[in-house]
Design a protein with these regions (language model features):
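C-terminal regulatory/interaction regions
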Residues: 198-271
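Active-site HxH/HxHxD metal-binding segment of metal-dependent hydrolases
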Residues: 1-95
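Metallo-beta-lactamase
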Residues: 74-83, 100-192
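Short, acidic/polar N-cap/turn motifs at the starts of alpha helices
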Residues: 90-93, 113, 250
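Residue-level signal for inorganic ion chemistry
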Residues: 170, 195, 245
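Aromatic/hydrophobic pocket-lining residues that form the small-molecule binding cavity
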Residues: 16, 151, 238
């Protein structure tokens, strides 16, 4: 690793966890500037306790959050604190040997997610932005008012890239980027409608309750049967879709018994 630099597409532990440990003496570690504030270190503004407070305000039971604190691998396997990360801005260029990659900002999965694209060869390192066998998790992020809206715009952004070789971070490495981006956008359009219809049928629910009534692709008979970590992901996904609807005036949020409750406004959920 003495002559190797590291580019982190985003902050999640399965992408960043070992970077500070395997670096060489002169290794540079790059990450999107908007993800940098969430990385463990002196620059971090993220605290798991704050996340728990926000989820509790959305109806997630405190006792289940306490169990998650002990079981959640994202908490137990966070990268070691490191203060040498170098921030990446959209359009930054990385020249190594004969290759010249451009950083493409693709927020949504995380606020600072970055893809690397080389115009000459059409090589594109997608990170977790577009996956071909599974759908990237889109959740609410501190400091981002509309993660899902950001993600949908990012899908449009990569659809315009001329690509020849795709390198996603998980599962299948082959696929049609434009077609898959359109499939992911259609998936979220259906989930937006599902969230809005759920609230319309039963107004005044918390995000935790709304998630329990939404349709999910998981082999469980009921919300009660969901594994706890999957409940956490589902509520985060529900929140991203609720934020999308609220920003566009389709949903309103109010305080109810110390928690946030949601009501649907009239109109088409996809407007």
């Amino acid at each position: 690793m003495e002559h190797t630099d590291i580019f982190l597409t985003h902050l999640h532990s399965d992408h960043t966890g070992l970077a500070p440990e395997i670096r060489g003496k002169d290794t540079k570690i790059f990450i999107g500037e908007k993800d940098l504030s969430h990385m463990p270190g002196p620059h971090s503004t993220f605290r798991w306790a704050d996340s728990d407070d926000r989820f509790a305000a959305e109806g997630f039971p405190r006792d289940l959050l306490a169990i998650l604190t002990e079981q959640n691998p994202a908490q137990g396997l966070s990268p070691i604190p490191y203060d040498g990360y170098l921030p990446v801005k959209p359009g930054d260029v990385f020249s190594y040997g004969e290759h010249r990659f451009t950083a493409v900002h693709t927020p949504g999965h995380t606020p600072g997610h970055m893809c690397l694209w080389e115009a000459e060869t059409g090589i594109c390192l997608l990170g977790d932005h577009v996956l071909f066998d599974i759908t990237p998790n889109i959740t609410r992020w501190m400091g981002a008012s509309d993660s899902l809206g950001d993600y949908l715009q990012s899908l449009d952004r990569v659809k315009g890239l001329e690509v020849a070789e795709l390198l996603p971070a998980h599962r299948s490495e082959t696929g049609d980027l434009r077609r898959r981006a359109e499939e992911l956008a259609a998936h979220h359009a259906r989930r937006i409608e599902n969230a809005w219809e759920t609230i319309r049928r039963q107004p005044g629910m918390t995000a935790y309750e709304i998630a329990g009534h939404m349709a999910w692709s998981i082999r469980c008979r009921s919300w009660e049967d969901f594994p706890l970590t999957q409940k956490f992901f589902a509520v985060g996904e529900a929140l991203a879709h609720l934020d999308y609807l609220e920003v566009r005036g389709r949903v309103t949020r109010r305080e109810k018994y110390g928690k946030w409750a949601y009501d649907a406004l009239t109109g088409d959920s996809n407007t």
